[in-house]
């Protein structure tokens, strides 16, 4: 685990740059979600779990 944490600090600059570019896409998706009111609560819970898994995968790269 320690080794993994060290590697992340080194590639943090690249991660930040990629994050900013993706921010626009995420905002678009959020607007679309707000439009669809039906089943928002259930979707939100499912999305949170998916997001956490996705982040862990991105970190490993």
From Swiss-Prot:
GO terms for biological process: chromosome condensation; sperm DNA condensation. Testis. Keywords: Chromosome, Developmental protein, Differentiation, DNA condensation, DNA-binding, Nucleosome core, Nucleus, Spermatogenesis. Signal peptide: none annotated. InterPro entries: Protamine_P1 (IPR000221). Its main location: nucleus. The keyword Nucleus applies. Residues 1-61 are annotated as: Disordered. GO terms for cellular component: nucleosome; nucleus. GO terms for molecular function: DNA binding. It is found in: Nucleus; Chromosome. The keyword Hydrolase does not apply. Protamines substitute for histones in the chromatin of sperm during the haploid phase of spermatogenesis. They compact sperm DNA into a highly condensed, stable and inactive complex. Belongs to the protamine P1 family. This is Sperm protamine P1.
């Amino acid at each position: 685990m320690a080794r993994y944490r060290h590697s992340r600090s080194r590639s943090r600059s690249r991660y930040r740059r990629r994050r900013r570019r993706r921010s626009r896409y995420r905002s678009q998706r959020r607007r679309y979600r707000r439009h669809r009111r039906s089943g928002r609560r259930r979707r939100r819970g499912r999305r949170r779990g998916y997001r956490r898994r996705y982040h862990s995968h991105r970190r490993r790269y």
